[in-house]
Amino acid sequence: ESVKFWAKEYHIDGFRFDLMGIHDIDTMNQLREELLKIDPTIFVYGEGWVAADSPLPFEQRAVKENVRKMKGIAVFNDEFRDGLKGSTFDEQEPGYASGNINGHFEPVKYGIVGGTQHPQVDYSGLLYCDGPYAAAPSQMINFVSCHDGYTLVDKLKLSVQGEHSEEELVPIDKLIHTVLLTSQGIPFIRGGEEIMQDKQGEPNSYKSSDAVNQIDWALKAKNRDIFNYIRTLIALRKKHPAFRIPTAEGLEKWLHFLDTGDSGVIAYTLGEYANGDEWKEILVAYNGNRNQADINIPEQDWIIVCHNGQIDLDSQEHLSGGDISIAASSALILYRQ
């Protein structure tokens, strides 16, 4: 009744449930059905876990493992979060994008396919679960930081190994957002993340002052390069439906991972004008290593959209394929017409 009131009287168009797992599946489904009657575009999502134990039997809990039973409801993808940036529970552990490839390869791929079933993902290599739990990519929210825990830049300061300045974290930050905004599913960005906002190293800032929690708008000028980079990634995603495939069947048909050997690079193609895209084939590759990596890609007349930390949707720079090098902590996005 409360949710219906907020939707009708205040026209709230999205509801996020903290610790959604303490609710039962039937209640969440009833809530979703009632909201559909008011406005079918209302978005419902939540944390697909509980803080401790619950008297509800596991099969009745509205947790991520049961999200297939909750059509039209999405959950946060903690596999992708911790695979990409490093453990939320160990502040010093780096993730895939910070050079910690082993143990984080498959969780990142899991996010790329929106938490759905895909024949090229090894689900035994995941961090917290042993299989796909989303029926469709729209049930999966990929993210790396939110109000809980460290901001992304604070986490990187703590976990990236070796001496480094904040400026030296920019390539890793760009790589993380490239993976986030080119993966299937729903991308989630914490406010301020796009300008490298920190919280002065405070992981639990609900009790902190505005000096810690407010957005420092001067960072938009200081970090204009990464702001523009992320803005262009968003434009790429909005323009190209290949990055927004709606079904698991479509992902299995159009998204294919490339064999990159032991390079540590994750690479895949989106082919056959995926999901009605104007580009015939798109190739995306991520190098999480802290050094250059070499891979082999199909020999085609590719046009370079993103490389070496730069992105240009109107680029006319060509690449013929074959053996190529990808700069440390960077992504490569190509397409052919």
Residue spans for each PLM region:
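Carbohydrate-interacting/catalytic domains
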Residues: E167-V170, L181-Q337
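Conserved alpha/beta catalytic core and glycan-binding cleft of carbohydrate-active enzymes
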Residues: R32-E34, I38-M196, N204-Y206, D262, ...
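Non-transmembrane alpha-helical segments in soluble domains
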Residues: V3-A7, R32, I141-V144, H177-L181, ...
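The substrate-binding groove and active-site-proximal loops of carbohydrate-active enzymes
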Residues: I12-H23, K157-E168, Q214-K220
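Pore-domain-biased detector for 6-TM cation channels and related repeats
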Residues: K8-H11, F80, Y268
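A short acidic (Asp/Glu
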Residues: T27-N29, P55-P57, Q200-G201, I295-N296
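Active-site neighborhood of glycoside hydrolase catalytic domains
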Residues: E1-P55
